[in-house]
Amino acid sequence: MGILEVRGVTRSFGGLRALQDVAFSVEKGEIRAVIGPNGAGKSTLFNVMTGLLAPDSGEVLFNGERISGVPPHRVIRKGIGRSFQITNIFQRMTLFENVQTALFAKHGKSRNPFARSRAFPEIAGETLHILGLVGLDDRHETSASVLSHGDQKRLETAISLASRPTLLMLDEPTAGMSRFESRETVALLRKISTEQGLTLVFTEHDMDIVFGISEKIVVLQQGTVIADGTPAEIKANPQVRKAYLGEEVAE
């Protein structure tokens, strides 16, 4: 059994079926991409897997425990972290304060998220450690508002790591980045996965990144899984090439 199991998940919105009998498994330590055209159901699938939406049928298991329909805050406590396509950070706070606030919530000290570091030295140390994982520890007193888009995504990854996840879900981690920032982000994700033993599941439109970092790929089209396999298997799949990779392959 994988660390994450998606079993026959179906989800509709009114008369629109966003997901239809979606099923795949993610192994511990794996880097897994979920790809598909716009409207394929990727965001809906992520929302079901993280508790923001309940499936109409089917289930999601994490470490063998059913989590579909479980509130998002409980999903986080079970070990799943998530970052979003649009950065979700406090712009008026420093990098240190952003991560520290997430740690206060994790440790049940949310009553005073703006407390001075000396009041909770263990959290201060952990905050700097997490910022170090994403290469931002030397800028911990910088306001989040002045960060580049790429560094804001790094900060959001740090905030996600504050929940101490064993599985991290990333929605378009390189969206809006320059080519240089994208390469840096890919290197960062590889480093985090290796050094922290994290399982990564991500969506991404940049096929160079998808095929450069993924160990397994699941392909969605109109809410249905049309392929699931290694990058080599996905590239060679005629249905995928026709439905999604045509332009990229032609290049």
Task: State each model region's role.
Residues 1-251:
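Glycine-rich phosphate-binding loops of nucleotide-dependent enzymes
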